[in-house]
């Protein structure tokens, strides 16, 4: 049982509208958002951030973003969040079953990663997780971005 259980319907006035706005049409709100909704001011603030992080305005491509999120959630054992991203975004990010498996329990040297960029993203996540630092090659991903948005 969760120490901080998510809200369950029926929701207080305003909560259902906020939760519906955070999900695609017709999709019930995920457990994470229902837990956030225990603090509506925080939920409202995170909604804007989430819309940016999951949008085309983000400095990472959809594929880059999902490689990073899937690897991070796997390394941190955030099974629920990993499952949400694999279910909602893996196909759109063109991640193969072998790549999803590698992000979960493999590494950047697995043969399913033919592109340097994918391997560097995985290495960057692993370095941050293991050492709280990023390697010079991973920092190099941001070299073409004068504002450093990719690295951020």
Feature map (PLM): residue ranges:
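Short amphipathic alpha-helical segments and their helix-coil junctions
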Residues: 44-58, 102-108, 135-144
